[in-house]
Design a protein with these regions (language model features):
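Regulatory and interdomain segments flanking nucleotide-handling catalytic cores
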Residues: 1-983
Length: 983
């Protein structure tokens, strides 16, 4: 290890404590009083300073007096500072104080560099003036009301004495009327100011956290208790204290005012801490006592590789998950190396293809080489992957220290170029591969495809190295069993699974002058430079984008799939009788075959105990097909069937898969309580989601994702497209083929389209959540309900729901108050879209494919327009909104036509389509399709609109896909529908 890096290890404790102090430098914002102080309805006598009063409720304040101190002198100086001073003084204005400690100045600079940008601060004087004006008006109104009370009292006294001069009383009444008119005018002005303030300031009892896409999802409450629960006596235990800080700060805000209420205190503090830690590391390495904090710069260090090369060719789910865990463990090791062992910086981004760290800007090439060598040494992936760390050439300062005078010098952290850049393929270390094979003559390991399959303790072609990892993964499952890693447990009643894939295209939000610059922080100036009134692309805000999208997929993985829980598993007690000298390996799965050829999958957990790892309903269906129907529950039927039987055991992944290893003599079968979701999550990263789900649940889950997307991203859906894909297959289809098809779907990126508005409608009535919408009906049949208010429906959203408009790109749109010229043309607010407008849309789509064979995956291929290359499937992918239409059309035909009728209609239509070589807008074929459907023997003919929808679907080819999906893939027609034949 180089001397430069050793100095970081020597100062580890000081660096990690400084990092914790940076995490806590704005801890005063995690207080209920802070929310109340910045509300429009705060009480007049309320006083709270988050930099002074933050610790008043804490039970333990000793940590504030801890000293952060360098181990050695740097240019004859020992650097030290108290945690308390960092928290209270580490602000951007510390740069203006000559005598301030450089450690405090560095934190102030890092605070500014990562800044939320406080865009509203540019109008801070105006806002304060409005607040003062409102207060003055309130006082004046009260003064006038007091004057009225006084005059009315005088009138009452005069009238009681009976000596009132009518002229005097009338004069007083006239004065009261005049004052009341003044009050009305003052109140009108005060109400107007209140309305403006409420557009920005939130209520003390109703302050919400927003996503960067304008969805307000959490009401802030109980901050004091959250802050008090942080274990401040553990500030020297980095892992525990930061975890506790994050758990508290994720419920607080860096800024409460709209529309900058999208950065949580967790997002904000984490970025400041990362910058501060790396700046101190740079100070130690460079040893510059004359360092000017204003000139601080940073770089990104990344380790990127194509993860698909690691787990994409896995032959089973346990192998896939073991490979994925192996990859992630090495990234965790890298994180520990750079964050704790040699505290150089922090991981600020991770996805399926690696990690990105923020590190100090150090020009010395020898240091950077030593750093790369250390990373290669510490995360070698045991020779299977050669890691290539990259220190980005471009340095950046974030927000320029004097940004008010020189905003052009702000530098957006160029992380998007890393994330969206080419991902290097992986390669093994040839020397290691050569050593593995010395003196070996055997098959190749089917897990790594590199090592020799030298395991003597397994019947499978696997190396000892990977046997331990794969069986170790299964052992972990056996100990918990709160989830599943077995494909057959996921399969539906028809033995089918679905790989559900999804992608949120966030690259446009991360790049310079990207979609963040389409979000105003105040009413846009139509004639002004968009850079002056749109949000800044601060590090904190960019970070918030990928954290939000990652959270979206994580919530899909947990919340949306939770309702499919299974509550029973079956355990079999049996004695294994081997054929030849075969053995069963503990923590392995095998195929069990009964005398009457009922097959299912079991897991050997040791001590003659086996667990059935297959959908119990599917096994029961197999049993019922050979015997009479029964009303018994699946687990009861299987127990009754299995007791006392002799069951042959096969290893489908073994070297002799066609020969039985032996047999099980079953002595007892019991059912166990279980609590697992039959879903195997694979990826839930910022821009990508993969999970294996039961085939018959895939559409329900897709609809739930669509609903969640429309609710949470509805204001920016034209700029943040969602891609969904469903790859259906039988449960024993090679998982590598299924994964390949899913990856192919995700490679199809959304292409910008131009949609003409048929009808723009302002919805008068709010929905059940009181939010208000603006409906856009497009000529292509798509309908969007765009949210145009913030949470609760009382505050108009003037910040998020904007659309790029085509026909007015080069000229100012007439009569559109809420419009401005953005980075790539004119943007108009959803509420001001008019009939006939042409909008630029990045559409969301969904696609599906059934792999009846592994080679079918090659048909998932797209042309330059994003459509399937295969002419038969050229209608795919469909707009995401068509998911609802698929359901509606299927309901229309399945409830009124028999299975045979549907099949016969499709045969007539598709045969004629092929024979006539039907093109686009073929009126003859349109008439033919209408006639065929009209002449069908409907049980009840659909309404005209529904019938027209079915005809249009038949002409476009959509009906063929709907029938394939529902009848051929999902087998919905097998649910006992009567079949009377005919057309």
């Amino acid at each position: 290890v180089s001397k430069d890096l050793n100095i970081l290890a020597e100062n580890r404790d000081a660096l990690l404590l400084a990092e914790v102090a940076a995490w806590l430098h704005d801890m005063g914002k995690c207080r209920d009083e802070h929310i109340q102080m910045h509300a429009y309805d705060k009480t007049d006598n309320q006083s709270y300073d988050y930099k002074k009063h933050y610790a008043s409720i804490l039970n333990n304040k000793d940590f504030l007096d801890q000293e952060i101190k360098s181990k050695q002198k740097l240019d004859d100086k020992i650097y030290f500072v108290l945690v308390k001073d960092l928290i209270e003084k580490g602000k951007p204005n510390s740069l203006k104080i000559p005598e301030d400690n450089i450690l405090i100045k560095l934190l102030g600079r890092c605070h500014a560099a990562a800044h939320i940008e406080k865009e509203e601060a540019k109008d801070e004087k105006t806002l304060k003036a409005e607040i003062n004006k409102k207060n003055d008006l309130d006082k004046l109104i009260q003064k006038k009301k007091n004057a009225i009370v006084k005059k009315r009292t005088t009138i009452n006294e005069l009238e009681k004495k009976g000596i009132g001069d009518s002229s005097k009383i009338n004069k007083l009444k006239d004065e009261i009327g005049s004052i009341e008119n003044e009050i009305l005018e003052f109140q009108k002005n005060a109400d107007a100011i209140s309305f403006k303030l409420r557009q920005v300031l939130q209520s003390k009892d109703n302050t919400w956290i927003s996503t960067p896409f304008g969805y307000e999802y959490e009401k802030i409450e109980n901050l004091n208790s959250r802050l008090k629960n942080i274990p401040f006596d553990k500030v020297n235990d980095r892992k525990e204290i930061i975890k506790s800080i994050q758990e508290a700060f994720v419920h607080a805000l860096g800024e409460t005012r709209r529309p900058t209420n999208e950065i949580t205190l967790d997002d904000w503090s984490g970025i400041v801490a990362a910058l501060y830690k790396s700046s101190l590391a740079g100070l130690l390495i460079e040893g510059e006592s004359e360092l000017d904090p204003r000139c601080l710069k940073w770089r990104f260090l990344s380790v990127r590789f194509n993860s698909e090369d690691i787990w994409g060719n896995s032959s089973s789910i346990p192998i896939l998950l073991a490979r994925k865990e192996w990859m992630e463990t090495s990234l965790d090791n890298l994180k520990h190396l750079l964050e704790e062992t040699y505290p150089l910086g922090n991981e600020v981004y991770r996805d399926e293809n690696g990690s990105v760290f923020v590190v100090p800007y150090i020009e010395e090439s020898e240091f950077n080489k030593a750093l790369k060598d250390l990373i290669i040494e510490k995360m070698p992936y045991d020779g299977e992957i050669q890691v290539t760390p990259t220190v980005q050439d471009k340095s950046w300062c974030g927000q320029y220290y004097n940004y008010k005078k020189h905003p052009e010098k702000n530098e957006v952290p160029p992380i998007s170029s890393i994330i969206s850049g080419d991902i290097p393929s992986i390669s093994a270390n040839p020397n290691d591969v050569e050593n593995w094979w010395k003196g070996k003559r055997c098959s190749i390991c089917t897990v790594s495809h590199l090592r020799p399959a030298d395991s003597r303790s397994s019947n499978r072609n696997i190396s000892d190295y990977w046997l331990k990892k794969v069986t170790g993964r299964a052992k972990k499952w056996k100990e918990q069993k709160e989830s599943t890693i077995w494909i057959d447990e996921v399969a539906d009643l028809n033995g089918k699974i679905c790989l559900l894939v999804g992608k949120l295209e966030i690259s446009g939000w991360l790049k310079e002058d990207g979609y963040i610059k389409t979000l105003p922080f105040k009413s846009p100036d139509k004639d002004g430079d968009y850079k002056k009134f749109t949000k800044e692309q601060s590090f904190a805000r960019i970070s918030r984008v990928w954290r939000t999208t990652k959270k979206f997929w994580e919530e899909v993985k947990t919340n949306d799939l939770d309702k499919y829980r299974i509550n029973k598993r079956i355990k079999v007690f049996a004695e294994f009788k081997p054929e030849e000298s075969n053995k069963l390996q503990i923590n392995n799965s095998y195929e069990a075959v009964s005398e009457d050829d009922i097959r299912f999958t079991i897991f050997y957990s040791g001590n003659n105990e086996y667990i059935i790892i297959e959908n119990l309903e599917l096994i029961a269906k197999k049993i019922k097909s050979k015997y009479r129907d029964t009303d018994k529950k699946a687990h009861e039927l299987i127990k009754e069937y299995s007791r006392g039987r002799n069951i042959k055991i096969y290893d489908p992944n073994g070297k002799k898969r066609d020969k039985p290893l032996g047999s099980l003599q079953v002595s007892d079968v019991i059912s166990e309580d279980a609590n697992y979701v039959p879903v195997i999550p694979i990826l839930a990263e910022p821009s990508i989601f993969m999970a294996i789900v039961p085939a018959d649940k895939a559409l329900d889950i897709s609809r739930a994702i669509k609903k969640k997307y429309e609710e949470e991203m509805g204001k920016v859906r034209n700029r943040l497209p969602l891609t969904l894909g469903m790859v259906f297959a039988k449960s024993h289809t090679p998982i590598s083929s299924i994964m390949d098809a899913g990856r192919r779907m995700l490679k199809n990126t959304s292409k910008e389209q131009r949609w003409e508005v048929k009808k723009s409608i302002e919805d008068k009535d709010p929905c059940t959540s009181n939010n208000k919408f603006h409906t856009l009906k497009f000529e292509n049949g798509i309908e969007w309900k765009v949210p145009v208010t913030m949470r609760g429906g009382q505050i108009k959203d003037i910040w998020y729901p904007y659309f790029y408009i085509v026909e007015k790109e080069d000229e100012k749109p007439n009569g559109r108050e809420k419009s401005f010229k953005g980075p790539d043309g004119w943007l108009v607010h959803a509420s001001e879209i008019e009939d006939g407008d042409i909008l630029r849309i990045l559409p969301s789509t969904f696609d599906f494919e059934f792999l009846d064979s592994s080679s079918r995956r090659f048909e998932v291929y797209y042309d330059d327009d994003g459509k399937r290359w295969d002419k038969i499937k050229a209608s795919r992918p469909y707009f995401l909104e068509d998911l609802d239409e698929f359901d509606k059309i299927w309901d229309t035909i399945s409830n009124a036509l028999s299975i045979s009728q549907i099949k016969n209609i499709m045969h007539l239509l598709e045969a004629k389509r092929e024979f006539w070589s039907v093109g686009v807008n073929d009126q003859v074929f349109q008439n033919y399709a209408s006639d065929v459907l009209s002449n069908a023997n409907w049980k009840k003919k659909p309404q005209d609109n529904d019938f027209a929808q079915v005809v249009d679907a038949a002409v476009s080819g959509k009906l063929k896909d709907i029938i394939e999906l529902y009848m051929s893939v999902l087998k919905i027609s097998e649910n006992g529908q009567n079949d009377d034949g005919g057309i």
